[in-house]
Amino acid sequence: MLKPLGDRVIIEVTEAAEQTVGGIVLANNAKDKPVTGKVVAVGSGYVLNDGSKQDLTVKSGDQVLFDKYAGQEVSFEGADYLALHEKDIVAIVE
């Protein structure tokens, strides 16, 4: 399994819709880049100025919204993930 470092988070991305609400099938280049996903792993946290650590707000299993162009795509053991910093996560979906 992937173990991110520091304030990084590994996201299993939710795929973009294949067709519109009206039933129009979208070409691959017409789909919006996904902005939602499930957190599958989190780093150990932030190192503060005094040397202490602060845990991340998100945790494994959280469904999140993130910035459209954030992160780096990563493939591991045949699966695709997105590695990003916690600051690029906009919200936790409840």
Curated annotation (Swiss-Prot):
A cellular-component GO term for this protein: cytoplasm
Family matches, as NCBIfam families: PRK00364.2-2 (NF001531), PRK00364.2-5 (NF001534)
SMART domains on file: Cpn10
Encoding gene, per UniProt annotation: groES
Membrane-spanning parts: none
Annotated CDD domains: cpn10 (cd00320)
Similarity section: Belongs to the GroES chaperonin family.
PROSITE patterns: CHAPERONINS_CPN10 (PS00681)
Predominant location category: cytoplasm
The protein's name: Co-chaperonin GroES
Superkingdom: Bacteria
Subcellular compartments: Cytoplasm
Gene3D superfamilies linked: GroES chaperonin (2.30.33.40)
Organism: Leuconostoc citreum (strain KM20)
Subunit structure, as described in the record: Heptamer of 7 subunits arranged in a ring. Interacts with the chaperonin GroEL.
Known function: Together with the chaperonin GroEL, plays an essential role in assisting protein folding. The GroEL-GroES system forms a nano-cage that allows encapsulation of the non-native substrate proteins and provides a physical environment optimized to promote and accelerate protein folding. GroES binds to the apical surface of the GroEL ring, thereby capping the opening of the GroEL channel.
Any one GO molecular-function label of the UniProt entry: protein folding chaperone
Record's keyword terms, sorted: Chaperone, Cytoplasm
InterPro entries in UniProt: Chaperonin_GroES, Chaperonin_GroES_sf, Chaprnonin_Cpn10_CS, GroES-like_sf
Gene Ontology BP annotations: chaperone cofactor-dependent protein refolding
